[in-house]
């Protein structure tokens, strides 16, 4: 009869030939860079799609339609941020189990994560669809763009189960050190999305509804590709027999990681909604400028975000292997990468911000271009604060202290609410531009001592 030890040995042998990467050995800088690069390229590609999407909407439908999509962005961050954060949290125990070479427990986490995600996706979708109109009213969406914003947002909410699916399965693939395949799936999805944008917006004349439908269909494709790859090339993740059972302990651990991370994004999203609401009250021009600048900002800042994502998997695997020395070295190397990239962004944004903004709107919209360029330049000065935030936050998450990372989201929310209540009324658009920098700095004031405390605690535990 086959013993559990035999099963583990067979699984370990399969892991060596599967499309996985052990981040507990080798140069930390090389491992982090190797893992982060496909993530960065994938998200740059995804953000470039958003840039193209905004250009199509802004130039062929109009500034009003662009503002309608932008008015929905902070609400989308609130809801989709919860989905993304929860699924990222579910991947942490998977990464830790993989690092510890406990593959049976890893698959038990996978099975229970799928159950939890299905329930969460259903509940979040129903609540979002029910309260969509009321939320748009609460954030002071201008009347002239309300209808388009409502249609676009409803279509995005209908795709929440697909968002959950892609983030769950791609997160599990990345937990095993493979960031390449999700990158390839994003390429395919983005190309399909752009083609559908052209067909549905320009060809069929569906307006912002066409943009929403295109996103829905491309997300469905990305989920199918993830499932296909896991079944064909990463069977190490597929639960078998008793590994499919419901497990209270594993479910509790998954929720303890996923819910705080999901809430962290949503709490941050509340602050962004407050800032969006204050900006909406300044009129359609400021809404369009905010939309334009945010699209370009995400194109640049996704690099910081994905260095952080790499750190979550890196720290999770090394914690499982009890290699805290590598965690410290990895964090230092990630900060070096972040600072090098900041210099690159400054060289591009400071001289060329106005030109970038003209990609979105006609040259006659000088006020929109000027305001958006101002937003980009102010934010760029504080990119090191953002880079430090993402590295420390995701490292803390990967080490299993998701509650602390959630508190950093609370710090961001408090900062953005304060800016919305005091700086925006006093400084108007300049106050809006200061929203992100103030939030990033306030989160760092919390995360720096929190990360040092987590390190000391885990090193003491490792010596016992």
Feature annotation, model-predicted:
Residues 48-67, 136-143, 199-206, 266-299, ...:
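Helix-terminus/linker motif at the lipid-water interface of multi-pass membrane proteins
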Residues 57-77, 143-148, 208-209, 250-257, ...:
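Interfacial/gating helices of multi-pass transporter permease domains
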Residues 87, 155-174, 182-190, 211-224, ...:
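Short runs within selected transmembrane alpha-helices of multi-pass transporters and secretion channels
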Residues 25, 29-48, 52, 75-82, ...:
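Residue-level signal for short hydrophobic patches within transmembrane helices
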Residues 1-36, 94-159, 203-259, 315-382, ...:
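Short alpha-helical transmembrane segments in multi-pass integral membrane proteins
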Residues 34-53, 155, 189, 218-222, ...:
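Transmembrane helical elements of multi-pass membrane transporters/channels
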Residues 66-126, 163-182, 289-353, 386-408:
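Small-residue-rich hydrophobic transmembrane alpha-helices
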Residues 78-81, 125, 193-198, 223-227, ...:
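Hydrophobic transmembrane alpha-helices of multi-pass small-molecule transporters
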């Amino acid at each position: 009869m086959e013993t559990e030890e035999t099963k583990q040995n067979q699984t370990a042998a399969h892991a060596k030939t599967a499309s996985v990467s052990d981040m507990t050995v080798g140069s930390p800088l090389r491992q982090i860079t190797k893992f982060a690069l496909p993530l960065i390229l994938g998200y740059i590609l995804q953000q470039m799609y958003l840039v193209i999407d905004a250009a199509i909407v802004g130039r062929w439908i109009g500034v009003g339609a662009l503002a309608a999509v932008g008015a929905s962005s902070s609400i989308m961050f609130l809801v989709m941020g919860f989905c993304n954060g929860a699924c990222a949290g579910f991947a942490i125990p998977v990464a830790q189990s993989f690092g510890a070479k406990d593959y049976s427990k890893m698959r038990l986490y996978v099975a229970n994560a799928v159950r939890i995600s299905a329930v969460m996706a259903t509940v979040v979708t129903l609540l979002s669809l029910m309260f969509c109109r009321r939320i748009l009213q609460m954030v002071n969406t201008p009347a002239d763009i309300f209808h388009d914003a409502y249609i676009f947002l409803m279509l995005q909410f209908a795709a929440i189960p697909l968002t959950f699916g892609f983030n769950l399965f791609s997160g599990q693939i990345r937990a095993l050190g493979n960031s390449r395949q999700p990158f390839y799936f994003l390429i395919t999805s983005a190309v399909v999305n752009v083609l559908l944008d052209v067909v549905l917006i320009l060809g069929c004349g569906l307006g912002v509804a066409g943009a929403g439908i295109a996103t829905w269909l491309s997300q469905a494709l990305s989920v199918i590709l993830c499932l296909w790859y896991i079944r064909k090339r990463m069977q190490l993740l597929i639960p078998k027999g008793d590994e499919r059972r419901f497990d209270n302990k594993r479910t509790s651990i998954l929720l303890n990681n996923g819910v705080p991370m999901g809430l962290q994004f949503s709490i941050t999203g509340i602050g962004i909604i407050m800032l969006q609401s204050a900006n909406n009250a300044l009129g359609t021009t400021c809404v369009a400028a905010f939309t334009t600048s945010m699209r370009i900002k995400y194109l640049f800042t996704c690099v910081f975000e994905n260095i952080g994502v790499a750190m979550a998997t890196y720290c999770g695997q090394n914690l499982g292997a009890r290699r805290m020395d590598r965690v410290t070295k990895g964090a230092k190397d990630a900060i070096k990468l972040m600072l090098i990239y900041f210099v690159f962004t400054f060289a591009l944004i400071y001289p060329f911000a106005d030109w970038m903004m003209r990609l979105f709107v006609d040259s006659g919209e000088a006020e929109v271009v000027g305001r958006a360029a101002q937003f980009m330049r102010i934010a760029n000065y504080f990119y090191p604060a953002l880079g430090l935030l993402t590295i420390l936050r995701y490292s803390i998450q990967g080490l299993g202290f998701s509650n602390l990372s959630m508190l950093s989201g609370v710090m961001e929310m408090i900062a953005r609410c304060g800016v919305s209540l005091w700086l925006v009324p006093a400084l108007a658009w300049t106050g809006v531009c200061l929203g992100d920098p103030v939030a990033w700095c306030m989160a760092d004031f919390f995360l720096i001592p929190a990360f040092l405390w987590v390190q000391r605690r885990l090193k003491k535990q490792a010596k016992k």
